[in-house]
Amino acid sequence: MRFLVSGGGTGGHIYPALAIARGLKNRYPGAEILYMGTSNGMEADIVPAEGFPFTGISASGLERKLSPRNLLALWQAVRGFCQAVEIIGRWRPEAVIGTGGYVCGPVVLAAVLKRIPTLIHEQNALPGVTNRILSRFASRVAITFADSLKYFPDQSKVRLTGLPVRPEILQADRKTGLQKLGIKEGRFFLLSFGGSRGARSINGAMLTVIKAFAGNPDVEILHATGKAGYQKFLDGCRAAGIELDKIGNVTVKEYIYNMQDALAAADLVVSRAGAATLAELTALGIPSILVPYPYASENHQEFNARALEKEGAALVILDRQLNGGLLSRTITELINDRARLQAMAAASRKMGKNRALEDIIDCIDELIRSKRRHF
């Protein structure tokens, strides 16, 4: 069996596509996967490194204002569509899967033209422009948040599957996580991070939080600054009189490589509101304080965060409102109100979709079986 997978532009589109590709390989032993993206996008480097064949087509994003660049983008879309039609005609996949990004436009439309079943997956609560358009033509739409449903005209083809979560996250457990981190059972463990590159606003607020809890025997803090903000954060600690090597209950790192252990052990998380992060938090039932990245396209991180807030799984502090005092008070209130924290954890767990990958593959399998019945 052959499958074509597409998604590009950002890791938020690429990694779900790769997860689905692996899921297809597991479900259909011997299946061949071809990944189609843009030759100059992140996917051109990431996908081959993950062991999947990659082919590039022409595609670029439209600007939201009138611009000469949009003429070039339209030309590239037409060219990319023709390239996709030729490649799909040659490859003849059983199904085509798109996870978003402008490259998916020509790929999915080419598959529709060739009468090949198509599934698109939307990671965010506010669907991207490409997926909103493609939903009119795709055979099936898989969504991560129930809040997304209202944005798709034909809701009969929409399935709430969730976002695939890394197996190591799903397999992690609290006791092992605490042991690996060297944290005593019974201590309140606060985990904070701002994504792989860190977040300046969260770093700034966490300085105040660390100062407030420095030396507290009942609270343990692990904060990841991101590479760019690491030295500045250490300098800020010194300027604030925080001696990290002496206070004993705070660990500061550039990046957390064993995130599965940190998440499994966490009682509370402070983070941005990217779809992958929220899928991991809800898979493990972790309550959170979310600070959406304010410059995400169409402000989609705030929509993601509000979806958790609405269900009682998270508190939301907007980036422009964030300061050390507010964050410190909010954390203290939650530490002192364990009933509320437990209710947030239960709400988070209820939102978790631990079978997301299996459910997405089931949708694809359903499309394949349906096509075979009709031909």
Curated annotation (Swiss-Prot):
Q: What is its EC number?
A: 2.4.1.227
> In which family does this protein belong, per the annotation?
Belongs to the glycosyltransferase 28 family. MurG subfamily.
Q: Which NCBIfam families match?
A: murG (TIGR01133)
Annotated Gene3D superfamilies: Glycogen Phosphorylase B
Keywords, A to Z? Cell cycle, Cell division, Cell membrane, Cell shape, Cell wall biogenesis/degradation, Glycosyltransferase, Membrane, Peptidoglycan synthesis, Transferase
**Pfam families from the entry?**
Glyco_tran_28_C, Glyco_transf_28
Q: Which GO terms describe its molecular function?
A: UDP-N-acetyl-D-glucosamine:N-acetylmuramoyl-L-alanyl-D-glutamyl-meso-2,6-diaminopimelyl-D-alanyl-D-alanine-diphosphoundecaprenol 4-beta-N-acetylglucosaminlytransferase activity; undecaprenyldiphospho-muramoylpentapeptide beta-N-acetylglucosaminyltransferase activity
| Reaction equations catalysed | di-trans,octa-cis-undecaprenyl diphospho-N-acetyl-alpha-D-muramoyl-L-alanyl-D-glutamyl-meso-2,6-diaminopimeloyl-D-alanyl-D-alanine + UDP-N-acetyl-alpha-D-glucosamine = di-trans,octa-cis-undecaprenyl diphospho-[N-acetyl-alpha-D-glucosaminyl-(1->4)]-N-acetyl-alpha-D-muramoyl-L-alanyl-D-glutamyl-meso-2,6-diaminopimeloyl-D-alanyl-D-alanine + UDP + H(+)
Identify the GO cellular component terms for this protein: plasma membrane
The protein's topology relative to the membrane is: Peripheral membrane protein
Instruction: Read off the CDD domains from this record.
Output: GT28_MurG (cd03785)
The UniProt annotation places UDP-N-acetyl-alpha-D-glucosamine binding at: 10-12, 124, 166, 196, 256, 301
Q: In which pathway does it act?
A: Cell wall biogenesis; peptidoglycan biosynthesis
- Please tell me the species this chain comes from: Pelotomaculum thermopropionicum (strain DSM 13744 / JCM 10971 / SI)
According to its UniProt entry, the function of this protein is described as: Cell wall formation. Catalyzes the transfer of a GlcNAc subunit on undecaprenyl-pyrophosphoryl-MurNAc-pentapeptide (lipid intermediate I) to form undecaprenyl-pyrophosphoryl-MurNAc-(pentapeptide)GlcNAc (lipid intermediate II).
Q: Which GO terms describe its biological process?
A: carbohydrate metabolic process; cell division; cell wall organization; lipid glycosylation; peptidoglycan biosynthetic process; regulation of cell shape
Q: Which PANTHER family does the UniProt record give?
A: GLYCOSYLTRANSFERASE, UDP-N-ACETYLGLUCOSAMINE--N-ACETYLMURAMYL-(PENTAPEPTIDE) PYROPHOSPHORYL-UNDECAPRENOL N-ACETYLGLUCOSAMINE TRANSFERASE 1
Protein name, as recorded? UDP-N-acetylglucosamine--N-acetylmuramyl-(pentapeptide) pyrophosphoryl-undecaprenol N-acetylglucosamine transferase
> Which locations, inside or outside the cell, does it occupy?
Cell membrane
